[in-house]
C-alpha cells in the first residue's frame, strides 16, 4: 500500500511541474471579473511602494527556486509522521495521507501563483496592494494584519527551534556556558544572524543560506529513509534497545474507536502549515529578474514539487519506522547513540 502511495506522490509532483507550462495558471480570470473602479485602482497603484511600474528584479530562476523551496521547507516537515500517528497506526493510513499531501500541495502552489499573477495584472509589488486592487481596499488592512501576525509567529518558531538546537550543540561541544542557555542562544542568533538576513534588500544573496538549509533537509530525508530501509529500529535492530518503549515502533495496535475520526485534521493542519509561504509570493514576483508569468510559474512549481517530495519521503519513512509512536519531532524517536541522528 505504501509503495502505491509513494508512486502517487511522485506522479502528482510530475503533474504539478507540468502546470508551469499552463499559461492560464493564477487568478487573472477571477480578477478580471471583479475589477475596481478606475480612479480607485489608480489610487491603489499610487500607494504601492513600487509605483505603477515595478523595478527590475535581481534574482534569476534558479536562485528563486532555492529561496522559495527553503521558505516552504522548515522544521515542520519533521512533525508530519506524527500527523499520521494522530489518527492511525496502520500502514494503510499512508494512502489517505498521500492524497491529502498531493491535494494540498497543488492548491497551495496554485494559490501562490495566483498572488504573483495578481501583482502582474495590477503592476503592484505587495500582497496587500494586490488584494486591495483585486478585492477591495476595505479589507486590505485585515490582510496586512494577518500576514504580520503569521510571519511574526513563523520567526518566533524559527528562533525557538534554533535556540533549542544550538544550545544543545553548545553543551555537547564545550562552548561557553552563556551559550548553554536556550534564551541566550535565541537572543544571540536572532540579533546576529536572523535579523541581518531579514534586512537584506537583495534576496539573491540568500541563495547560499538557502542551499545550506536545503542540504540539511535533504540530509534528514536521506537519513530517515536509510534507517527505515536498514531496519536499525525494528525489534532486534541495532538501536531498538536504546530507545524508550514509548518511542519504539508500534503498528496495528489501535482498535476501532480508539481515535476520533476528526483526528485526521491534525495532519491536515500540519500539511497546510507546511506549504504556507504565501506571504512571500509578491516578493518573489518583484525580485525575479526579467520577470514573466512563465518564469514565475516555473519557480513556483519546481519549488513546491521538490518540497512535496521531501515531505512525502520524511512522512513515509518516519511513519513506517515508528508507526503510532512517531513523535511530534521525529528526530526525538532516534537513539542518542545513533551518530547519523545526532548529525541530523
What are the residue ranges of the model-derived segments?
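Membrane-water interface regions at transmembrane-helix termini and the short interhelical loops
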Residues: 83-87, 191-212, 287
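Extracellular loop-to-transmembrane helix junctions
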Residues: 81-124
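Residue-level signature of the transmembrane alpha-helical core
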Residues: 69, 98, 102, 145-148, ...
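Central hydrophobic cores of alpha-helical transmembrane segments in multi-pass inner-membrane proteins
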Residues: 75, 105-114, 190-199
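Transmembrane alpha-helical segments of multi-pass small-molecule transport proteins
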Residues: 8, 67, 71, 101, ...
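Cleavable N-terminal signal peptides of Sec/SRP-targeted secreted and luminal proteins
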Residues: 4-18
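Membrane-interfacial loop- and helix-cap regions that link adjacent transmembrane helices
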Residues: 56-57, 62, 113, 119-144, ...
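Membrane-interface "cap" regions at the ends of multi-pass membrane proteins
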Residues: 16, 21-82, 87, 109
Amino acid at each position: 500500500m505504501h509503495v502505491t502511495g509513494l508512486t502517487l506522490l511522485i506522479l502528482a509532483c510530475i503533474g504539478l511541474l507540468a502546470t508551469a507550462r499552463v499559461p492560464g495558471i493564477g487568478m487573472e480570470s477571477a480578477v478580471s471579473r471583479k475589477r475596481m473602479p478606475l480612479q480607485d485602482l489608480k489610487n491603489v497603484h499610487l500607494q504601492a511602494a513600487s509605483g505603477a511600474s515595478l523595478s527590475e528584479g535581481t534574482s534569476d530562476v534558479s536562485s528563486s527556486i532555492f529561496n522559495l523551496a527553503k521558505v516552504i521547507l522548515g522544521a515542520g516537515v519533521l512533525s508530519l509522521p506524527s500527523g499520521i500517528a494522530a489518527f492511525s497506526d496502520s500502514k494503510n493510513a499512508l494512502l489517505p495521507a498521500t492524497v491529502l499531501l498531493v491535494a494540498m500541495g497543488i492548491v497551495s502552489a496554485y494559490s501562490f501563483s495566483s498572488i504573483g499573477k495578481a501583482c502582474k495584472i495590477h503592476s503592484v509589488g505587495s500582497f496587500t496592494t494586490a488584494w486591495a486592487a483585486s478585492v477591495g481596499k476595505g479589507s486590505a488592512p485585515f490582510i496586512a494584519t494577518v500576514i504580520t501576525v503569521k510571519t511574526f509567529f513563523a520567526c518566533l518558531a524559527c528562533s525557538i527551534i534554533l535556540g533549542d538546537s544550538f544550545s544543545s550543540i553548545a553543551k555537547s561541544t564545550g562552548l561557553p556556558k552563556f551559550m548553554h542557555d536556550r534564551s541566550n542562544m535565541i537572543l544571540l542568533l536572532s540579533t546576529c544572524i536572523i535579523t541581518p538576513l531579514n534586512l537584506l534588500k537583495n534576496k539573491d544573496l540568500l541563495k547560499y543560506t538557502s542551499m545550506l538549509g536545503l542540504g540539511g533537509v535533504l540530509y534528514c530525508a536521506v537519513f530517515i529513509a536509510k534507517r527505515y530501509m536498514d531496519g536499525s529500529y525494528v525489534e532486534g535492530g541495532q538501536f531498538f534497545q536504546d530507545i524508550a518503549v514509548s518511542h519504539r515502533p508500534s503498528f496495528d495496535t489501535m482498535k476501532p474507536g480508539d481515535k476520533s475520526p476528526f483526528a485526521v485534521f491534525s495532519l491536515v493542519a500540519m500539511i497546510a502549515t507546511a506549504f504556507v509561504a504565501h506571504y512571500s509570493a509578491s516578493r518573489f514576483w518583484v525580485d525575479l529578474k526579467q520577470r514573466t508569468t512563465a518564469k514565475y510559474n516555473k519557480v513556483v512549481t519546481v519549488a513546491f514539487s521538490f518540497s512535496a517530495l521531501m515531505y512525502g519521503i520524511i512522512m513515509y519513512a518516519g511513519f513506517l519506522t515508528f508507526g503510532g509512536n512517531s513523535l511530534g519531532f521525529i528526530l526525538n524517536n532516534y537513539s542518542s547513540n545513533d551518530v547519523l541522528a545526532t548529525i541530523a
